[in-house]
From Swiss-Prot:
Protein name in UniProt: Uracil-DNA glycosylase
Family, per entry: Belongs to the uracil-DNA glycosylase (UDG) superfamily. UNG family.
Active site per UniProt: D59
Species of the source: Staphylococcus carnosus (strain TM300)
Reactions that this protein is recorded to catalyse: Hydrolyzes single-stranded DNA or mismatched double-stranded DNA and polynucleotides, releasing free uracil
First-level EC class: hydrolase
Top-level taxon of origin: Bacteria
SMART domains referenced in this protein's UniProt entry, alphabetically: UDG (SM00986), UreE_C (SM00987)
Described function: Excises uracil residues from the DNA which can arise as a result of misincorporation of dUMP residues by DNA polymerase or due to deamination of cytosine.
Pfam families according to UniProt: UDG (PF03167)
SUPFAM superfamilies: Uracil-DNA glycosylase-like (SSF52141)
Keyword annotations: Cytoplasm, DNA damage, DNA repair, Hydrolase
Length: 221
């Protein structure tokens, strides 16, 4: 199974013509993030048969030079968002390495599917592309990973992500849940939750190579 087959199966069962027509108009008349060629970057960087971890986000960042198709990740020249800073703070406390880069492309190449539930957004208008069809598409992606892959770690931060647990076969996958890393909630249970080491412990217990969360640029403790 690969992403092309997954996409083919999804589009056979759901009609996304209205969504694509809407997006064509949006991209031609407004500023939309990410750039069109980066909408599906999460799937380009993480092949289906390499998925080990799924981190579920919500909408892309809606500021300039930020969104590039990976949940929580920011373009190298983009402004560092607070949620990502908190993710890195927890990473340092959990594993002992200090990341300084704003993008998560190395995580994606390691097998971490960084999946937003909505894949596009209008500049400066959070949630502007919700309920146009993306949620149907990404729910099917989650179900496909759950059905056709084994021993994947699903990391669900915040209530919207945790609502996706119903799509996951928890008898053969691990689910790690906490509040969102946003500054509004991080101190209510995200800090100290150790998602990175917990994910690796599960992967190693099932014969998988652990994720290198630190990356080459990180300072390791």
């Amino acid at each position: 199974m690969n992403w092309s087959e997954v996409f083919h199966d999804i589009t056979n069962r759901h009609d996304f013509k209205e969504m694509h027509d809407f997006l064509d108009k949006e991209y031609s008349t407004k500023t939309v993030y990410p750039d069109k060629e980066n909408i599906y970057q999460a799937f380009d960087l993480t092949p289906f048969d390499k998925v080990k971890v799924v981190i579920i986000g919500q909408d892309p960042y809606h500021g300039p030079k930020q969104a590039h198709g990976l949940a929580f990740s920011v373009q190298p020249e983009g402004k560092f968002p607070p949620s990502l800073r908190n993710m890195y703070k927890e990473l340092e406390d959990d594993i002992g390495c200090k990341r300084t880069v704003s993008h998560l492309q190395d995580w994606a190449r390691e097998g971490v599917l960084l999946l937003n539930t909505v894949l596009t957004v209008r500049k400066g208008e959070a949630a502007s592309h919700r309920n146009i069809g993306w949620e149907v598409f990404t729910d099917e992606i989650i179900k496909a990973v759950s059905e056709y892959r084994d021993h994947v770690v699903f990391i669900l931060w915040g209530k919207p992500a945790q609502q996706k647990e119903r799509l996951i076969d928890t008898s053969k996958h691990d689910v790690i849940k906490s509040v969102h890393p946003s500054p509004l909630s991080a101190y209510r249970g995200f800090f100290g939750s150790k998602p990175y080491s917990r994910a690796n412990t599960y992967l190693e217990a099932h014969g998988e190579t652990p994720i290198d969360w630190c990356g080459e640029e990180a300072q390791r403790g």
